[in-house]
Amino acid sequence: MGYNVAVVGATGNVGREMLGILAERSFPADEIVALASRRSQGVDVSYGERTLRVKALEHHDFSGTDICLMSAGSAVSKEYSPRIAAAGAVVIDNSSAWRYDSDVPLIVPEVNADAAAGFRKRGIIANPNCSTAQLVVALKPLHDRARIKRVVVATYQSVSGAGKEAMDELFTQTKAVFQIDEITANKFPKRIAFNLIPQIDVFMEDGYTREEWKMVVETKKILDPKIKLTATCVRVPVFISHCEAVSIEFERPITADEARELLRNAPGCLVIDSREPGGYVTPYEAAGEDATYISRIRDDATVENGLSMWIVSDNLRKGAALNAIQIAECLVNRKLITAKRKAA
């Protein structure tokens, strides 16, 4: 028996990726329902070779739903996720609404799949921030070997992390530069075309942005609360894939060669690291791929036990949609949920 799956936010960047990945990975679904706001009702979206007609979220009956993949933002999730869970579905939420709730597991399957069983408290599992997801996938095998003390990370985050309107703004502004037209910034605080913006999300009282705060708190919750982390998050004029320049200090000795071998054998990781021109991965190459790519692995001579590296991943896939579906697969494969209903 397959599962009845609802995708909420099916017309957005991540929602569309979710539908595509469900089909790609042949997720055992008897029924897939595409849901969005009332203004998107009737829009067609792709699910593999099939076309689904989007239905309105507010009118949907979730009593027959087993798994709900939620990607409609925090406000919608806060309103609907508890209702959907109360109807008997497991909600896997991509927003930040539930990540910091102690009763809601925050899951990256390659890192802390065992914690997924905690969904029974609220009926909700949280997906981490896109930048956190790829970071902890790479950190996990290194932490297991040498115990991480401190991480310093600078992110280079693509505009798709801010939604379709942000991608449209980069395209429009880039075209305007070449046509010598006026450039208007709407989605970002400054123009993004041919520029970098060292602000993602709002500023907090201590000078960090909320995006930077998310990376700190989420890494601690997923991997180890003892890890110290500081982040600088930057928006860059790239459509898809996030990059991270990471320096790590360990409690125990570990060499670049040892790290390279560990990462080559770690789930979800793909090492591309040749010390020659082009011997690394860029955001262009990672787009559309599932792996977390690690390059530029090297010893950091500024600390006793240190490494530096370059991490790249498709933020719409591992950073969002793929991770959510891997969580659903984890629930199924570990028999944490049972398909109790057949599609009507």
Regions found by a protein language model. Give the residues of each.
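Generic solvent-exposed, charged/amphipathic alpha-helical segments
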Residues: 19, 216-220, 260, 264
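Short acidic/glycine-rich loop or secondary-structure boundary segments that cap or lie
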Residues: 161-164, 204-207, 238-242, 256-257
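Helix-loop-beta segment of a Rossmann-like dinucleotide-binding subdomain
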Residues: 119-126, 195-206, 309-311
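C-terminal active-site/capping subdomain that shapes the small-molecule cofactor and substrate pocket
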Residues: 227-344
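N-terminal Rossmann-like NAD(P) cofactor-binding subdomain of oxidoreductases
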Residues: 1-192, 228, 256, 261, ...
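A glycine-rich, Thr/Ser-enriched phosphate-binding loop motif common to dinucleotide/cofactor-binding enzymes
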Residues: 123-134, 207-216, 221, 319-323
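Oxyanion-binding "anion nests"
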Residues: 192-239
